[in-house]
Amino acid sequence: MTKLDKGTVIAAALELLNEVGMDSLTTRKLAERLKVQQPALYWHFQNKRALLDALAEAMLAERHTRSLPEENEDWRVFLKENALSFRTALLSYRDGARIHAGTRPTEPNFGTAETQIRFLCAEGFCPKRAVWALRAVSHYVVGS
């Protein structure tokens, strides 16, 4: 039997997600897939919401290749490329946008967000409008 760790659970959950979709993704089905008892999953994830948050993070880590601006990049180009990359990441898994829409930023993503805001501020945005611009792009891509 393979050692059950967080990465193994996430990989199996992403496979299952593609097969059955978000509404049918249950911890019971995931435990069956992993050949473990359901409580074993709670060692790694407190609840289904925590699992879904981890899935959203994994999708972005795997496929969102333009989350940071390039040196001397125009802010318009960055926002466009960021949106396209974000969209590609969410479309790479069934119900990816729905899963991401229910998440909140987590500590590992704070640095990325701060870099994006600093970049936009250096391009002439005030901090408030930089956040608005990033949120607008995110909401446009996700559809919320």
Show where each model-derived region lies.
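Hydrophobic alpha-helical connector segments
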Residues: T65-F110, P127-A130, L134-V137
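Short, basic, alpha-helical segments at the C-terminal edge of helix-turn-helix-like DNA-binding modules
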Residues: A58-E62
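Short acidic alpha-helix initiation/capping motifs at coil-to-helix transition points
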Residues: A31-E32, P108-A113
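Generic alpha-helical structural context detector
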Residues: D53, E57, T88, R135, ...
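Hydrophobic alpha-helical bundle segments that form small-molecule/ligand-binding pockets
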Residues: T112-S144
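Helix-turn-helix
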Residues: T8, A12, L16-A50, A54
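N-terminal intrinsically disordered/low-complexity leader segments
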Residues: M1-L4, E15, H64, L68-E71
